Amino acid sequence: MNEKHPGPLVVSGKLSDGERMKSESNFLRGTIAEDLNNGLTGGFSGDNFLLIRFHGMYQQDDRDIRAERAEQKLEPRHAMMLRCRLPGGIITPQQWLGIDKFAADNTLYGSIRITNRQTFQFHGILKGNVKPAHQLLNELGLDALATANDVNRNVLCTSNPVESALHQEAYEWAKKISEHLLPRTRAYAEIWLDAEKVATTDEEPILGATYLPRKFKTTVVIPPQNDVDLHANDLNFVAVADKGKLIGFNVLVGGGLSIAHGDKNTYPRKASEFGYIPLKHTLAIAEAVVTTQRDWGNRTDRKNAKTKYTLERVGVETFKAEVEKRAGVSFSAIKPYQFTGRGDRIGWVKGVDKKWHLTLFIENGRLLDYPGRSLKTGVAEIAKIHQGDFRLTANQNLIVAGVPEKDKARIEALAREHGLMDDNVTSQRENSMACVSFPTCPLAMAEAERFLPEFVTRVEGILQQHGLADEHIVLRVTGCPNGCGRALLAEVGLVGKAVGRYNLHLGGNREGTRIPRMYRENITADEILLITDQLVGRWAKERHVDEGFGDFVIRAGVIAPVIDSARDFYDVQEAM
């Protein structure tokens, strides 16, 4: 535990404008309902531009045509991205068919994007289709409440179909945590579902009238898999089992990856171990962590508002003691746990329940019908006959779960027919990931999703050239320092700096338990590949048995490990 810099429990000073917006929003209503009927613009204006995020949407535009439209004196082509709340990533085939049809009929791009937070996004919903989108989700038994902005976001849960009973228990807790921490305001139901307006004052007993200081992310993790990247999250419940039965959780708090270029007061941070709790205290601890962050988080500076900064300011032990006090629970010592990897097991695996589970690799999570590979149609065809469920993974893949032996051949035939199973996909491609970035993300500084496939092809060539064709490096590209692509937990992480330029980070590990350090700043893809070629050449010759690339570059002295990111993340480390 690190108590080097204890500071004030509450940061004084002028509140950020985001706090004003929330306090004046009437519990997230704003004037969204009126704005919906304003046909003079395709977007939401004023505070509503940000308030719609609490309702699961971001206002975006097509940046590929932004300049062209400006020349024509037209406003940007505004469209919304809508993100579903899907704790643990489980969705039924019937629900899938509903979202498949909506994407085809009512979005500009016609695609479904599986995210690395185990849900799906629609991109390109025009303003007139926004309300029908929410109503469709509601008809399917889904919603988009609290999938963005200053609330507890979609709760992740390890996708472990083999240990079916344990996964089911963990998944149930992910759902309970999600429901417990949801906003209580009726704004979502009133605006999107035409719920009757009730003459009572809204109350937010957990989140408070101005909600949280910043976004808050929660996971339920089943070791030895760390597919959900717990160190990217504010609150983590690491499953502890006895004889295959869930008995409690190790609790880790204060992870997070987003930074701001040029601002050394921002840094990534691994989550800190608080201790072990039995199952019965799970919701009390979740609530206590959230309310402590609600009350102590920095509301004067949004760049310094996340839980990780609160922990560094007040000290881990102080924060932990407050959580114990609020929950009326004392943490026990952490129970032993270990992570061995993060990747999904692509292909068929048989669970202890004798059912089969097929993990389909979906490059960058983008389901669309491409020439010769009708991926989106293929998943829909599987949904028409599948009797189990679908599970969206934190690696942006799709699991067809709970397949009886008699249906296995038929489902595989459909998957192969539509290009969803490809025996030629390399381990390197399976272990590479990017955020959406251009053309829809307004924060994008460099390409990510559109850049990754060809970049991976070139990395595959380097591995093959050095006799490592069957090896892989955990490779991630994020289009800006907000870090949605989780590049700052990769062995090789690219963080977008400008169009065509990235900061290159090296030295994470395969398990996702070490933050990579910046090795080169603001360089091109060609420069990155040249460095990769040189270092992979050394890795091929000098590595120990089963030594991953990230571990190798640390051991070989290419770069020093990040030990305490709040203090050493920006230390300059010259290559040896």
From Swiss-Prot:
Residues binding [4Fe-4S] cluster: C435, C441, C480, C484
One GO molecular-function entry: sulfite reductase (NADPH) activity
Cofactor(s) required for function per UniProt: siroheme; [4Fe-4S] cluster
E.C. code: 1.8.1.2
Keyword Cell inner membrane attributed: no
Keywords for this protein: 4Fe-4S, Amino-acid biosynthesis, Cysteine biosynthesis, Heme, Iron, Iron-sulfur, Metal-binding, NADP, Oxidoreductase
The reaction(s) this protein catalyses: hydrogen sulfide + 3 NADP(+) + 3 H2O = sulfite + 3 NADPH + 4 H(+)
Broad enzyme group: oxidoreductase
A Gene Ontology biological process term: sulfate assimilation
Entries under InterPro entries matching the protein: CysI, NiRdtase/SiRdtase_haem-b_fer, Nit/Sulf_reduc_fer-like_dom_sf, NO2/SO3_Rdtase_4Fe4S_dom, NO2/SO3_Rdtase_4Fe4S_prot, NO2/SO3_Rdtase_4Fe4S_sf, NO2/SO3_Rdtase_FeS/sirohaem_BS
Disulphide-bonded residues: none
Known pathway: Sulfur metabolism; hydrogen sulfide biosynthesis; hydrogen sulfide from sulfite (NADPH route): step 1/1
Function noted in UniProt: Component of the sulfite reductase complex that catalyzes the 6-electron reduction of sulfite to sulfide. This is one of several activities required for the biosynthesis of L-cysteine from sulfate.
Subunit comment: Alpha(8)-beta(8). The alpha component is a flavoprotein, the beta component is a hemoprotein.
Sequence similarity: Belongs to the nitrite and sulfite reductase 4Fe-4S domain family.
Protein name per its UniProtKB record: Sulfite reductase [NADPH] hemoprotein beta-component
Organism: Yersinia pseudotuberculosis serotype O:1b (strain IP 31758)
